[in-house]
Amino acid sequence: MLKRACLVLFIKTGLLFGAAPFVRAQQPPTNPEVYSQLQFRYIGPVGNRTTAVTGVPGQPYLYYVGAASGGIFKTTDGGIHWEPIFDAQPVSSIGSLAVAGSDANVVWAGTGESFIRSHISVGSGIYRSLDAGKTWTAMGLEKTGRIGNVIIDPHHPEIVLACALGHAYGPQPERGVFRTTDGGKSWERVLFVNEKTGCSDLAMDPGNPHILFAGMWQVEIHTYGRTSGGPGSGLFKSTDGGATWKRLEDHGLPKPPVGRIAVRVAQRDSERVYALIETGDGVPIDGKTTQSGQLWRSDDGGENWQLVNSDRQIRGRTHYYTREEIAPDNENEVYFFSAAFSRTLDGGHTLTNMPAGPGGDNHEMWIDPTNGDRMAVVNDGGVSISVNRGHTWDHVQLPIAQIYHVTVDDQIPYFVYGNKQDGPSYRGPSNSLQFAGFGGGGGGGGQIPRSVWHPVAGSESGFATPDPVDNNIIWSSGTGSGSVGGAMARFDERNRQARDVEVWPEDVSGASAVEVKYRFNWEFPITISPHDHNKVYVGSQYVHVTTDGGNSWQMISPDLTRNDKSRQQISGGLTPDNIGVEYAGTVFAIAESPKEAGVIWAGTNDGLVQITRDGGKSWSDVTKNIPNLPEWGTVSNIEASRYDAGTAYITVDFHQMDNRDPFAYETRDYGRVWTAITKGIPHSMLSYAHCIREDPVRKGLLYLGTENGLYVSFDDGKNWQPLQNSLPHAPVYWIAVQERFHDLALATYGRGFWILDDLTPLQQLTAEVLASNAHLFAPRAAYRFRPVAQPAAVFYDPAAGHNPPFGAVLNFYLKANLGEKDRARLTISDASGKVVREIECRPARPEGARPAAGPGGPGGAGRGEGGPDARPCEAKAGTGGTCGASRAGRSS
């Protein structure tokens, strides 16, 4: 360790912008702390899906909101400002939230979204906070998958019940209703039907905590379809606080089979109970007759029931909605959530749409039990708050966008592209060039306002890929938000107009996979050839190619899938739901070798890997060569190496086949031999891999995204280490490297786009560097940007992104921490040797300590980021400690 000494690092500007050479990976560092000072930054866009909400009676400005896969946010000023309070936890999907009525500091969070669809994340149990969300502790139930409701005894906060649906990808014992009487130290499964049935809803009598109702739901979902309903589903009641339960049958209730159930007990009159019950609407299923109806009501505490409404608007797509809430001061006033937002004022007999809706795709609602005018609704657009019983709403969008893919162009500064759930394809800047005024100051970067993002055609679930030669042309796709299978457009940024160029225009709404001409998946691939930017590939069950801008398409493959017709049937169970999402037997990934034209890889969502070496004339199935690969996985990503024509990497996702282990492989001989490369990725409920990417500078340096994080390998996948740093634990669906700026861009499915600025420390981190006492990494090129006019925008926006700091970034490595009086000094000189600037770095302050006054750069410890307005430079052992750098750089 350096003690009482000043480390002096000399830099000449003539070397400042030297290009980093290609280097080969060597012995990896064993401690991620080495590069922990490299920080990600969020850039946008506005987010969407929320799934849980609660307020606190008597505290009108306090709300907690749970995102579908973006963690928990809290506001204490009625929704003006929001703070993420769950990012330190290894899970981001929130299924339920509850605050103890006897102690508002006690908050419980059940993880795992329970609104079932193909692209949702699972949880890792239940968490508790004793300080109003400042800190959290995992309290068990790790394998329950999805906890859709948590109920706390109003008088005894240590008594908690959890409604566990299960992961729903196969049978499991960790389903049903669980209860703790000791604050989560131990749990008892108090209601269990079978391993195919879980809890869909749970309700407590507001006046008697011993009386409980539970909806149990038999459901299973796979890549190829969803089955809702069965003998396990039903409505249950307990009169002893959940210790024992009785199935409620007959007495006016629908006969089985039934599916998802939601239940609520009125506060003003606890004899009034409402149950939303999924039926088959009279359509036979598996040869069995089904009943019709939507809403049942009991006026005697659940003893007898009557069907009061059969309007499908109440529950819409049952697996995705089926929720209700009763006004605390009127047992006849009930709210229902689906794509619409409806209300009854006469006990369920008639429905009325609200004069102003909270949004679309509504999922959950909280009404203040002491004030029926105060309410909050979470939906696919964020959270909406009303203080006048729903006559008007304040709509809030949080930084929780669910992004499917990310691509980048090569402009200066570059733009980022991708598709957002419940939105179109988007384009936004990595740097909005607004350094001052709007949310920022001086040379510190400023914010990226939501208004600088705009749609580029496409839809929620696909790709947005710029032409590498003409970045004004963007190929956008997405079957979501529409009924056309394989929907694709060619967007021109110059006039912001798009032209539809899909392979085959076909309305697939309501059609099973076996009925359509081309089986385009919800997120079918678009790949532009690295050898010819006019050649664009897409995948159905075939690989299609265009060379004339989408005017015509040719098939260059046979059906590359298993084509198992038994797994191409109607999806949904009691309520059919066919919109192209659960289409199996589709090409899910396409990659052409950057090294050798005509070498094209294709992966399917029924578990096959195929290769052609002659541009599609002949194909070889190399799946059998992959060791220990189960069947029916989704080949989610193929990365063809830029270094060797025969080398490729794949990730295979099995989570919808009830296997959440990570699967990643490498081949170096065109698929003849494969090697598993997952050592170091921990096995958990959230281990499954989505994407693998090769570094364009350093051979053997790889990046891999899983359902709850990012990993890096310095040795070609032999070992993996976390690269999480400041990144929330949202699913990392896609990865891109911007080569000019050496930036790593991520598409997170729950927290939007994130960028790790400047990968050069990782690209240059070798065993020799780690053995040295100190090392200065060759900096990347810096640009002197001029600020642009600021758009009209509110000063504070929780969904606004963050610009990179202004100026050059200097990264250095220290083997040991500096002592209290030690300093590291960076001396910058010009080509003649004249010193133009010196920057002194002090030891990093303890976490939570206030920064010392003085100039410096806006970076973390051990890294230098530009501008004379920078904060003090700090350094500690490891890579990425930052010091302020000069504004020298190339004009742009």
Describe the residue ranges of each PLM region.
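Glycine-centered tight-turn motifs at strand-turn-strand junctions
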Residues: 631, 685, 835-892
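Extended low-complexity, serine/threonine- and proline-enriched intrinsically disordered segments
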Residues: 298, 546, 823-845
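Contiguous beta-strand segments within globular domains
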Residues: 785-825, 829
